[in-house]
Amino acid sequence: MASSGGELGSLFDHHVQRAVCDTRAKYREGRRPRAVKVYTINLESQYLLIQGVPAVGVMKELVERFALYGAIEQYNALDEYPAEDFTEVYLIKFMNLQSARTAKRKMDEQSFFGGLLHVCYAPEFETVEETRKKLQMRKAYVVKTTENKDHYVTKKKLVTEHKDTEDFREDLHSEMSGFCKAAEALNTSAGNSNPYLPYSCELPLCYFSSKCMCSSRGPVDRASDSSKDGRNHHKTMGHYNHNDSLRKTQINSLKNSVACPGAQKAITSSEAVDRFMPRTTQLQERKRRREDDRKLGTFLQTNPSGNEIMIGPLLPDISKVDMHDDSLNTTANLIRHKLKEVISSVPKPPEDKPEDVHTSHPLKQRRRI
Amino acid sequence: MAQKPKVDPHVGRLGYLQALVTEFQETQSQDAKEQVLANLANFAYDPSNYEYLRQLQVLDLFLDSLSEENETLVEFAIGGLCNLCPDRANKEHILHAGGVPLIINCLSSPNEETVLSAITTLMHLSPPGRSFLPELTATPVVQCMLRFSLSASARLRNLAQIFLEDFCSPRQVAEARSRQAHSALGIPLPRSVAPRQR
């Protein structure tokens, strides 16, 4: 059966509002009741057809309302279009497709001057060039989005592997000494970080000395390229010209995984973008990061009491002053010793009450005899 | 009525898509199949879902549904393919799975949306640059496009014209045109059904 018109401005099947689906299974019911319809790029258009506009001379208001969603190129009333009594039909052409999509989504089924608007696309009004451009833009958008996504996926894989080898990392850290460990951490972070997040390379760089910077700059670029191509972490690590034995143990124990605070930082800074992490994992991450910072801090500052559980800020050590008198020195030492005892005894009970620690900690510290 | 699988709200996008696919495969209700297929086809519009859709083999599900008798299912399936085929990985999957003949078959559907989606899908499947996929520019297909370019429907005319201009060489078009003059009726034009006016 032929349609009532192939001419522009006549009723088409895709203009008709379909009935809302009421037999949907509960788990797939959306927030708004919707018809069963598939939207393809063919159906979407910068041209919108608006039906159900009350015939009370509100064209200007209508256009102003739609203009909220984007620039409008042209608009006109469609007088020949079959319309309900006392309603008018308008055609609005937006400058770009995205505005039209938003406008349709927001304005469809909205009340307007007492009438209910029905908004739909009108691709039949497009010229050949407009259709061609529409298809090309859609293709470009998809290609660009999936290319970006590929790199996020690479980063995601690195993160999940990183979590698996947490234990490996702890062991490695305890084995190696200060600077070497820092260098290793720098290597892994630089080598396996996302090439599209250059700051992830730079963050650990500014932590550590400039010695690392020059030598790892070159490999970073090569590493990023090869990780993009093959995702073969053996190769990326092979490019590094640091300590050979260090590298080998790295490769053997870590294999394809990342292990360093730098990568953690890069990941968390872009957490909001793509990753869904349950809250418990976030808390664990933060705890781990705190511990790593502490460990790095202790390595750099050579804290003798390395096994303390530190809660709250690291207070400055009380300087030891020689009083040039034996009895005075003894007294001073006793007091210092007492203070240390008091400080160290505080963290133990309030593992359940961290707030008390924070408040009681400075109080005890300030007591002077 | 369709079944109601228990889906945890926290299961995420992949879980939801999995539930849809499962329902599609298990349900007996045509309505439910249509709803689920439409849902999947709309998901196929958003590139962020492509990884999941490939994982769940939804592309094969779409290709299989092209052979269904229910015209609505075919319309939704080809719509889904049309939505996701600009992506390179999806395109390769469809080509390797032998999807091109199935999509060419859709050109003879009486449903206008199906035909439009099929044409667009074929255009996206063409390799970039001026090299053409031989199946796409075979004479029957070009002849079909020539007939579409004379259609009363503006949308069909436009798409056919773009296909002939951008995806066929002038020689192929000329050859198809000359053969058409002698051959019997080719692929029938689709019709779009509009409801009667009040």
From Swiss-Prot, chain B:
InterPro entries: ARM-like, ARM-type_fold, Armadillo, ARMC7. Keywords: mRNA processing, mRNA splicing, Phosphoprotein, Repeat, Spliceosome. One of its GO terms (cellular component) is spliceosomal complex. The keyword Repeat applies. The keyword Protein transport does not apply. GO terms for biological process: mRNA processing; RNA splicing. ARM repeats lie at residues 57-99, 100-140. It comes from the Eukaryota. The modification Phosphoserine is found at residue 169. As a component of the minor spliceosome, involved in the splicing of U12-type introns in pre-mRNAs. Component of the minor spliceosome. Within this complex, interacts with RBM48. This is Armadillo repeat-containing protein 7. The gene is ARMC7.
